Amino acid sequence: MTKSDLIEQLAASRMHMPAKDVEAAIKEILEQMASTLQNGDRIEIRGFGSFSLHYRAPRVGRNPKTGDKVELTGKYVPHFKPGKELRERVNIIE
């Protein structure tokens, strides 16, 4: 599902809200989440999961094209940990 798909589905299920308003709300939610992570804070949505930053230490990588070794600097990357309810909901055993 893409962001556009999400906006379309939410607008269809919320007849009283125009797609333009749904799109603005989704964009604002995502912007607030990005800003929170950028500030180094954690986001927790109960029943869904939490977003945080994980540090990746500097390391020596390899250029896949040439095979040359490349020094990679340390960096922070977003990390998502699903909540118990989400894990149980998607654990479909057939």
UniProtKB/Swiss-Prot annotation:
GO cellular component, one term: chromosome
Keywords, ordered alphabetically: DNA recombination, DNA-binding, Transcription, Transcription regulation, Translation regulation
TM helices/strands, residue ranges: none
Pfam families attached to this UniProt entry: Bac_DNA_binding (PF00216)
GO biological process: DNA recombination; regulation of DNA-templated transcription; regulation of translation
MF (Gene Ontology): DNA binding; structural constituent of chromatin
PROSITE patterns: HISTONE_LIKE (PS00045)
Job description of the protein: This protein is one of the two subunits of integration host factor, a specific DNA-binding protein that functions in genetic recombination as well as in transcriptional and translational control.
Subunit structure: Heterodimer of an alpha and a beta chain.
Family from the record: Belongs to the bacterial histone-like protein family.
Protein name as it appears in the record: Integration host factor subunit beta
Organism name: Aeromonas salmonicida (strain A449)
